């Protein structure tokens, strides 16, 4: 008797569903990051961290463009909540920046820490399925994750952990991000 051994845990249909889920949620996340930094820069453009925020925003614009290309390539529609996420993220950016540079950087730390963990979870899922099939996506997500974690470190270097009520602020922001991720994975 012969046994067929498969490395991948997914059928073709479930593999496509996995790719769609990852691209849809990551597009939403990169859209959110783009809007957060736009909101922060609207408030802090002339400040000591204005150029730092601008640099991170430029990188997020490139990340969003990458996700737009992946969505088009794999025919993945954006989450229907994109307009809501866009407004909420811009408001988060403005609101965190109104707390000063520490507030803006606390927001960066909270978001980028969670997104780094989220990218790691996705990478593990793709590796468990089939590294060869997902080679291109693994390379892209690894690069994006590394750049997001660099943003996290930038937030730490620029006193984000000194923001008023840092722990509460971080918890609120990460809870909101987790909710957005859960929604975008499905819709």
UniProtKB/Swiss-Prot annotation:
Alphabetic keyword roster: Iron, Membrane, Metal-binding, Mitochondrion, Mitochondrion inner membrane, Monooxygenase, NAD, Nucleus, Oxidoreductase, Repeat, Transit peptide, Ubiquinone biosynthesis
CDD domains (UniProt xref): DMQH (cd01042)
Disruption phenotype: Worms show deregulation timing of a wide range of physiological processes. This leads to an average lengthening of the worm's early cell cycles, the embryonic and postembryonic development, and the period of rhythmic adult behaviors.
Binding-site residues, Fe cation 2: 60, 112, 148, 151
Any one annotated GO CC term: extrinsic component of mitochondrial inner membrane
Chain residue ranges for the region called 2 X approximate tandem repeats: 28-187
Keyword Transferase: no
Transmembrane spans: none
Pathway recorded for this protein: Cofactor biosynthesis; ubiquinone biosynthesis
Residues binding Fe cation 1: 30, 60, 63, 148
Textual note on the cofactor: Binds 2 iron ions per subunit.
Binding site for NADH: 21, 186
Transit peptide range per the UniProt entry: 1-8
Lipid bilayer topology: Peripheral membrane protein
Subunit structure: Component of a multi-subunit COQ enzyme complex.
Protein name, entry field: NADPH-dependent 3-demethoxyubiquinone 3-hydroxylase, mitochondrial
Lineage summary: Eukaryota, Metazoa, Ecdysozoa, Nematoda, Chromadorea
């Amino acid at each position: 008797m012969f046994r067929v051994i498969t490395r991948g845990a997914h059928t073709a249909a479930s593999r496509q569903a996995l790719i769609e889920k990852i691209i849809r949620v990551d597009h939403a996340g990169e859209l959110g990051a783009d809007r957060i930094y736009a909101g922060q820069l609207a408030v802090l453009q002339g400040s000591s961290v204005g150029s730092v925020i601008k640099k991170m925003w430029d990188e997020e614009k490139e990340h969003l463009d990458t996700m737009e290309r992946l969505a088009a390539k794999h025919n993945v529609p954006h989450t229907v909540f994109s307009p809501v996420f866009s407004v909420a993220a811009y408001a988060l950016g403005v609101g965190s920046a109104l707390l000063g540079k520490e507030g803006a950087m606390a927001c960066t730390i909270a978001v980028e820490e969670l997104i780094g963990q989220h990218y790691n979870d996705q990478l593990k899922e793709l590796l468990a399925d089939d590294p060869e099939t997902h080679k291109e996506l693994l390379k892209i997500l690894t690069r994006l994750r590394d750049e997001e974690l660099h943003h996290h470190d930038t937030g730490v270097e620029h006193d984000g952990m000194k923001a008023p009520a840092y722990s509460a602020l971080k918890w609120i922001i990460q809870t909101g991000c987790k909710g957005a991720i859960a929604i975008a994975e499905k819709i």
